Amino acid sequence: MSRSNTATLDSRSNRFVLTHFVWRQIASLAGFVLVGALALAIAALSTWNVADPSFSYATSNEPTNLLGYGGAVFADIFMQFFGLASVVALLPAVAWALVLIRGTHFDKVLKRLGLWFAGSVLASAALSCVPAPITWPLPNGLGGVFGDMILRFPALFTGTFPTGTFATVLACLFTAPAAWCLVYSAGLIGVSEDEEAEPAPEPAPSKARTIRDELEEEDEEGPLTVLMGSLAHMRYTAQARLRRAFGMGAKPAKRQYDEPYDFNNDEFGTLNEPVRPKAQAGRIEPSLDRSERRIVTPPPIMGDEDDPPFDIDERRPAGILPDDDEDDVAADWAPRPAPPKPALAMAGSRVAPPRPKAGQRVEREAQRSFVDEDGDFTLPPIHFLAEPKNVARDASLSADALEQNARMLEGVLEDFGVKGEIIHVRPGPVVTLYELEPAPGIKSSRVIGLADDIARSMSAIAARVAVVPGRNAIGIELPNQRREMVYLRELIGSRDFETTKTKLAMALGKTIGGESVVADLAKMPHLLVAGTTGSGKSVAINTMILSLLYRLRPDQCRLIMIDPKMLELSVYDGIPHLLSPVVTDPKKAVVALKWTVREMEERYKKMSKIGVRNIDGFNSRVEQALAKGEAITRTVQTGFDRQTGEAVYETEEFDLSPMPYIVVIIDEMADLMMVAGKDIEGAVQRLAQMARAAGIHVIMATQRPSVDVITGTIKANFPTRISFQVTSKIDSRTILGEQGAEQLLGMGDMLYMAGGGRIQRVHGPFVSDTEVEEVVAYLKTQGVPQYLDAITEDDEDENDGGGPAGTSNLADSEDPYDQAVAIVLRDGKASTSYVQRRLGIGYNRAASLIERMEQEGIISPANHAGKREILVPTEAEITGR
């Protein structure tokens, strides 16, 4: 009987070993498959781009995702529903893969999956409490659709999405249960109820005898019975395992044993040998880590050398369980889940909100400063600029609100007889672009003419309508209910501004889609800026200047600032980049422009002698010569020898000093044109036509974009223009050649026209006076400006007085009134049009001069024919005497 029982036990053990080995291999294979799936998911999420084709965005462009279209769709679905919590949702899967690779599997599968989903949703809700940055491309928050859905419940009581302290409290309340759910679903916590009851005591020595007695009481079975029993046992075991794996099995009842089984002792090993009690020091509690439990290696089940090796702690012997409890057999024979590891404890940690793509400059400023080669000058640190504020996202930019507005806009257009479909919506920080694909036969001019009607019907302040270049669509731009502010710091510290290869990079602002706009003044090569008072023109000039100061040293770029208003640019007086003090006198402004023209001509002579075509070639040649320790020379013929008649040559050596860029900034062109229009226009025209190769560039701004200020000559030589808000369509056409600037919103909202004529809407950044003053104060500590007196000193004998036909009497005084009186007394003509033509000024200015002469008794009031008499002796009368 004993031998028969031993044979039966041996066959059962062999079947168990084989079944267990197969299941371990399947689990390991599933673990590696899960690792591969995780790698693909991480690759898809890391290369996610909102502009890739997906279920929520239709485009003909090729996907930029690393996994192609499938990866783009997967990443879009996860980002749309979970937001940044998609990364957190993948962490439990990492723990699952590690456990499966070890050949084990989890119990309570459905419960863990449910807690995983709940934890991911709660993590999304916690992230949605964090205000989304202005660079967030999705209409939902950082937690996606699920996060916004959870926050709608507290919003029912507060009336709006949680913000401030309330949002922080909610984020903490969501984070704790989310962390617990994710950690539990990963298998890092959640010990079975049997193991949590109490530590298992040491097995009694009579346990082996009890098992032996039970085996001896069994009837002797033949080979056929053993085979059929084995097949039935394998069938029921597999069935119970599958039912438990998919959650279809009933929860095992809590079982009570006379003496609980100790994993460190193997009763089957004691069937043929006496039981030796273990020492207390070798006892391992079930709650400890698996690696610690494997310190004590138990003997094999049967002690035979032919048995395959496997871990004794990953199975339980069948002899100690009732034969009629098949579900419990499968449950107890199942591999135990791996205990938690410290490396996976971050599964429930909170993910920080994303920041705008900052460049390396922001990171390097904490380590070292930007110092030039000589170590004398340090570029200003970026912390002088204000940080962007975390503003709660606009509820009107949600997907539902945008879809509703698109349908409403289609209805408005259909009311005016324009049929079409809104094919795409691009929400931005200030305005939202709705791309309309008109029906065949609809003219774009017809839709553009409905801009005011569209704004009225949509209850908007203004609406701008323009054709989208390169697409069969018409763009309709409507302002957002809540306007987001663009800060200069996020543009200066962005990767686009830092990594650009442009020479004179200027941060202009952000597009409708939130992309940074960095323009190169060296390629423009000159810039015309126009806009009414309060439109953001002066702030834009400050941002352009700060962009140059944050990127270039004084030996690389020098500035000449002309500010007739004496308020806007005077704050920069004293920085090392200036070639002269800020020019506020209009007469000295003419002198400064003429010096710039002479400097341009001198640079052309130098470049011609060396044989280069532009300033970059000149500086490159100088750097190469300095690196090699050579001198740049040129051999020229100076004449002939009188005795031999041979040509005489001399070697001319050039000064090896690189030429910096020169940027001339004119803040108010209208005032200069009023005082000395012809001289200003002539100097600006020469600079605009020729100064590009010499490294001299002009930024000219005006608040009166009329044809007498922005003349045809100036427009022809300034292909790059920026228009802020203007008052009429005529002014918009004067600047850009088309309407649209009158529909801008002000406060930095601009239309940027590059050299090719393509117009782009840009939202300019804001920089306060305090930020400018701090940067200027820092630059003043870096060095003293080296002014050139020749810039504002006129050594030439000028007799034109600013007009085309002036005489020597006009040069005696710099006052326009004295010049006008001299013209009237000399020529004997006292009319407004005559004074206007002689002085080259505007009609209103000339009329005011005539009225002043009348008040001072120089001329008489106009008679019925408009004629005026000169009441004082004229120059001809005095000469005749």
UniProtKB/Swiss-Prot annotation:
GO biological process: cell division; chromosome segregation
Domain of life, per lineage: Bacteria
Annotated localization: Cell inner membrane
Membrane topology per record: Multi-pass membrane protein
TM stretches of this protein: 26-46, 81-101, 114-134, 169-189
Residues that, per the record, bind ATP: G534, S535, G536, K537, S538, V539
Gene3D superfamilies assigned to the protein according to its UniProt record, in alphabetical order: 3.30.980.40, P-loop containing nucleotide triphosphate hydrolases, Winged helix-like DNA-binding domain superfamily/Winged helix DNA-binding domain
Protein purpose: Essential cell division protein that coordinates cell division and chromosome segregation. The N-terminus is involved in assembly of the cell-division machinery. The C-terminus functions as a DNA motor that moves dsDNA in an ATP-dependent manner towards the dif recombination site, which is located within the replication terminus region. Translocation stops specifically at Xer-dif sites, where FtsK interacts with the Xer recombinase, allowing activation of chromosome unlinking by recombination. FtsK orienting polar sequences (KOPS) guide the direction of DNA translocation.
Name of this protein: DNA translocase FtsK
Species assigned in the record: Rhizobium meliloti (strain 1021) (Ensifer meliloti)
